[in-house]
Amino acid sequence: MVREASELFAQNTLIVILPNQNSAKIEALQDLAKPGIKIVLAAPEVPVGNYSRLFLEKAAQQSAFPTDYKERVLANVVSEEPNVKQVAAKVQLDEADAGIVYGTDLTPEVAGKLKRLEIPAELNQLASYYIAVTKTCPEPKAAGKFIQFILAEPGQKILSNHGFIRVPKHH
């Protein structure tokens, strides 16, 4: 499938998004477990949906959260979406009180319409993105140059400007 080993080029974390008016008065991650809170998640088979559930499991193991935190939050889920953009759209349209998305999904287009609630690093799930030249690539030299660009400072700066986490320097 690939000509050489793939390389890590960017990473992403999860955040909780809330509608600007925040009528459910969500101030902390623990509030997601309160009865009556309407939450939208990506479906479990979608990467962000899987990562969201892993976050809930990690939180339930912390003393600051109830041991049944995951079950209580999942009981509040009103919709499971096929992709992360649909999660953001439902929260933006005020069809839910909260949703879990990637940090990069809080784009400038929606940033004014949504609030961000951070998930601390010890509870968060790191999504890692890899890049490689495929064996069937018609222009492997050009693809290789593109990969070099993405891994170098200019490419990492562009990714960082769009909310991705920079990867350690390659040698």
Whereabouts are the PLM-identified features?
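N-terminal post-signal-peptidase region of extra-cytosolic proteins
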Residues: 1-2, 129
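Exported/periplasmic ABC-transporter solute-binding proteins
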Residues: 7-12, 18-171
